Amino acid sequence: MLYKGDTLYLDWLEDGIAELVFDAPGSVNKLDTATVASLGQALEVLEKQHDLKGLLLRSNKAAFIVGADITEFLSLFLVPEEQLSQWLHFANSVFNRLEDLPVPTLAAVNGYALGGGCECVLATDYRLATPDLRIGLPETKLGIMPGFGGSVRLPRMLGADSALEIIAAGKDVGAEHALKIGLVDGVVKQEKLIEGAIAVLRQAITGDLDWRAKRQPKLEPLKLSKIEAAMSFTIAKGMVAQTAGKHYPAPMTAVKTIEAAARFGREEALNLENKSFVPLAHTNEARALVGIFLNDQYVKGKAKKLTKDIETPKQAAVLGAGIMGGGIAYQSAWKGVPVIMKDINDKSLNLGMTEAAKLLNKQLERGKIDGLKLAGVISTIHPTLDYAGFDRVDVVVEAVVENPKVKKAVLAETEQKVRPETVLASNTSTIPIGELASALERPENFCGMHFFNPVHRMPLVEIIRGEKSSDETIAKVIAWASKMGKTPIVVNDCPGFFVNRVLFPYFAGFSQLLRDGADFRKVDKVMEKQFGWPMGPAYLLDVVGIDTAHHAQAVMAAGFPQRMQKEYRDAIDALFDANRFGQKNGLGFWRYKEDSKGKPKKEEDAAVDDLLASVSQPKRDFSDDEIIARMMIPMINEVVRCLEEGIIASPAEADMALVYGLGFPPFHGGAFRWLDTQGSAKYLDMAQQYQHLGPLYEVPEGLRNKARHNEPIIPRLNQPVRLVL
């Protein structure tokens, strides 16, 4: 053994060939700060071996290196810029030493090589991969850019266009594509990986392969003519501006850095990468996006822990077909859980099956499946008008009309048709689970399972724990949701649960703005372009359905009369009374017509102004900041109340529910991350300017207490990571 560290070791393999093996404690290798330091120490030993002929890098895990240790990132971002820059110089000196070894080097890459793992293998001369390879640089998705030489080496290896596509989009690619673009030099079966790697190294050692020529382009300026460079970078910047926009600075910074570094050799290019990386690491966007990643891991880990002793349902059922029922049935069948879809009439069943078939055909058109797979999946959805087969199902979700009487009747009837241990769930969006459970003989086997529309796209499923819901019931529904590829988040029962409970105060803020003379078009524009929502409130209401929102608004007002009971007729009432229900009938705040692809396209409709004038004061202008404040304060206050009341268990789960369920702008990181970025004291000052607007603008007492001491809601890291140089 030449060297033994905590996460890697160095040893002789055969005949002058050494192997550097990544073998961290635990299930995966990560390129954390300690591993970078250990790699430097291993190279120091290696550089003293005069009989060294070649070096093989490999992993003892199922994946090569899954990336940097993202749990270090938030504390790493606290490191002062000068110190962080120094550490990056050190880290890059380690990878440069690997690249500069006077012998051929090869990385035998199995499974994942992402982020720092990818940058590590880019420093070797050859890369041999297994068929399960996923390799790429996802850093821009975390608000940063490659910092270990990825933005320097990848363009010089692949050419500007392929490298820009991977780096700017934060992409990873599979083995076949990596081989095609030159990111790896060969693909071999896992059992032949080491044998093949040694064979390549031997050819390099004997001179049959020119490893020096392979290495040289990575040390030189990017080989592009002025015209080629202008075309590549102009197109890349245009694409990034269109897709990422101003709220996500990392992709554009990465493209501009690669462009600026193109005319330099390795050392100066790495300096430019360093100068770009460090400021990005200190942005609110980076903290927010890394926070989302960590929150996502926390939420999924919690779901896994809750279901560790639970068997995933093998047979499911959906009550109520139509678009929603068909979407749920499709998602279950697509992910391998056969489903019975029951309704009381053929028309609805046909609609549900048509929806499932439409979604499967889209997969076929995209080349994700073939006709055989399509037929196999659709055959596991069984439409029925009766309860045949319900004695074999493990879990049933009810998705009938949002009417408590109807839901109670359907659930009570179904309970008599299933086994005693079968779990029942309701896809209600606002009706308290306790109310629906009152119709059941076994309320402990019942909970809420709130899907978001469209089911196949929206990641979130709210799992609502009723007062009598058992832990096993909750775990079974979590297991099914996870199997369906969803992110389940458990919330406690109340009107609207979590997501809709905090959404309707946001809509109330919108209604008050319109009442006071705001133009809904400007509000939509500000909330989309400035704050970053995918849809402004008027557009969102049209998509949800004005009739649906009108009904839900009444449910919320009954549940929280002190805050959500209206004292005036608002814009939603006016549109509802005029039968303008949104996209579903082509008229809402906006007018909708089908585009060439059959999708609804919004257009202005002057008639709506006369309608809204009856519930609004004369038009007046509001600043962007005032619109954002008046829209967001009611939502943020309600989110805080939900945490204080135990409706949602943690800030992490609240933020992920809003990002995955409502499309809360990821660069803000969620409601609590946004609140902490503002600072609780600053937020309180802002909210107090609008408290005259009513109870929705009154800051909860718990948040007031934190504001007095300017305390964060998300626990704040006090210590930056200790960097080893």
UniProtKB/Swiss-Prot annotation:
Keywords: Fatty acid metabolism, Isomerase, Lipid degradation, Lipid metabolism, Lyase, Multifunctional enzyme, NAD, Oxidoreductase. Residues 311-725 are annotated as: 3-hydroxyacyl-CoA dehydrogenase. Its EC number is 4.2.1.17, 5.1.2.3, 5.3.3.8, 1.1.1.35. It comes from the Bacteria. The keyword Lyase applies. GO terms for cellular component: fatty acid beta-oxidation multienzyme complex. GO terms for molecular function: 3-hydroxybutyryl-CoA epimerase activity; delta(3)-delta(2)-enoyl-CoA isomerase activity; enoyl-CoA hydratase activity; long-chain-3-hydroxyacyl-CoA dehydrogenase activity; NAD+ binding. The keyword Isomerase applies. Gene3D superfamilies: 1.10.1040.50, 2-enoyl-CoA Hydratase, Chain A, domain 1, NAD(P)-binding Rossmann-like Domain. Substrate binds at D296, N500, Y660. The active site is at H450. It catalyses: a (3S)-3-hydroxyacyl-CoA + NAD(+) = a 3-oxoacyl-CoA + NADH + H(+); a (3S)-3-hydroxyacyl-CoA = a (2E)-enoyl-CoA + H2O; a 4-saturated-(3S)-3-hydroxyacyl-CoA = a (3E)-enoyl-CoA + H2O; (3S)-3-hydroxybutanoyl-CoA = (3R)-3-hydroxybutanoyl-CoA. Residues 1-189 are annotated as: Enoyl-CoA hydratase/isomerase. The record marks E119, E139 as: Important for catalytic activity. Pathway: Lipid metabolism; fatty acid beta-oxidation. GO terms for biological process: fatty acid beta-oxidation. Heterotetramer of two alpha chains (FadB) and two beta chains (FadA). Involved in the aerobic and anaerobic degradation of long-chain fatty acids via beta-oxidation cycle. Catalyzes the formation of 3-oxoacyl-CoA from enoyl-CoA via L-3-hydroxyacyl-CoA. It can also use D-3-hydroxyacyl-CoA and cis-3-enoyl-CoA as substrate. This is Fatty acid oxidation complex subunit alpha. It comes from Salmonella paratyphi A (strain AKU_12601). The gene is fadB.
